């Protein structure tokens, strides 16, 4: 099995926000035992969804849960800067295109209980790949192996991929950057994701300037507590 290592700078970064993600992890646990497969998305790129996905997966693994992090943002993956491989790796797109077995793409990491599926090479037809039978087949094969599966998806405000992925998930979380995305765009993204049939679990308000007292513009979405204030 291929091994990935989280670079030291990313581990240090995650340590700084450990308390916040532990709170989010606890809220997910309280949301219901059935919420095990979670899609993480945002309205636009650069809002911090990939860092959120990674930090949440780390928190779950460090709490003793066998966790799989899937990089499904195959159009614009940024996780190659977070995880370094010790050899040649295959990823999600290799599996979805029929060019790899499931066991070939699940990688161990230097964090106990955390495994990762890298995105793989950028495909010419990412949406079509996600719609083929392989994606649901993969979820069916792994859902009883892991305690939690965290899937980093493309931004729902740009492409429909996140909704396709969410259809196979128990719930989804929206990550949005404070002061960047207008409320109506966040609401539209939530509605688009809900059309997948997946359960809306909340919004994580990211990159918050803590000197500002309130963030009422985003309304009451049942988000994961007022302490979920993080950086990308």
From Swiss-Prot:
Dephosphorylated and activated by CpsB. Pathway: Capsule biogenesis; capsule polysaccharide biosynthesis. Keywords: ATP-binding, Capsule biogenesis/degradation, Exopolysaccharide synthesis, Kinase, Nucleotide-binding, Phosphoprotein, Transferase, Tyrosine-protein kinase. It is an enzyme of class 2 (transferase). GO terms for molecular function: ATP binding; non-membrane spanning protein tyrosine kinase activity. It comes from the Bacteria. GO terms for biological process: capsule polysaccharide biosynthetic process. GO terms for cellular component: plasma membrane. Autophosphorylated. Its EC number is 2.7.10.2. It catalyses: L-tyrosyl-[protein] + ATP = O-phospho-L-tyrosyl-[protein] + ADP + H(+). Belongs to the CpsD/CapB family. NCBIfam families: eps_fam (TIGR01007). Involved in the regulation of capsular polysaccharide biosynthesis. Autophosphorylation of CpsD attenuates its activity and reduces the level of encapsulation. May be part of a complex that directs the coordinated polymerization and export to the cell surface of the capsular polysaccharide. This is Tyrosine-protein kinase CpsD. The gene is cpsD.
């Amino acid at each position: 099995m291929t091994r990935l290592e989280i670079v030291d700078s990313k581990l240090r970064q995650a340590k700084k926000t450990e308390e916040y993600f532990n709170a989010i992890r606890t809220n997910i646990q309280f949301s219901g035992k059935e919420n095990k497969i979670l899609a993480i998305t945002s309205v636009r790129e650069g809002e911090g969804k990939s860092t959120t996905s990674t930090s949440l997966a780390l928190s779950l693994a460090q709490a003793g849960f066998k966790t799989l992090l899937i990089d499904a943002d195959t159009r614009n993956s940024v996780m190659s800067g977070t995880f370094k491989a010790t050899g040649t790796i295959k990823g999600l797109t290799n599996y979805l295109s029929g060019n790899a077995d499931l066991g070939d793409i699940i990688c161990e990491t230097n964090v106990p209980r955390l495994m990762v599926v890298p995105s793989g090479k950028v495909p010419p037809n990412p949406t079509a790949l996600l719609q083929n039978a392989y994606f649901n087949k993969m979820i069916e094969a792994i859902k009883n192996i892991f305690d939690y599966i965290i899937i980093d998806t493309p931004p729902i405000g740009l492409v429909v991929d996140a909704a396709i992925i969410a259809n196979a998930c128990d719930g989804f979380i929206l990550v949005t950057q404070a002061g960047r995305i207008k409320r109506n765009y966040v609401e539209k993204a939530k509605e688009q994701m809900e059309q997948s049939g997946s359960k809306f679990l909340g919004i994580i308000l990211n990159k918050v300037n803590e000197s500002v007292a309130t963030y009422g513009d985003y309304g009451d979405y049942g988000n994961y507590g007022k302490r979920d204030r993080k950086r990308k």
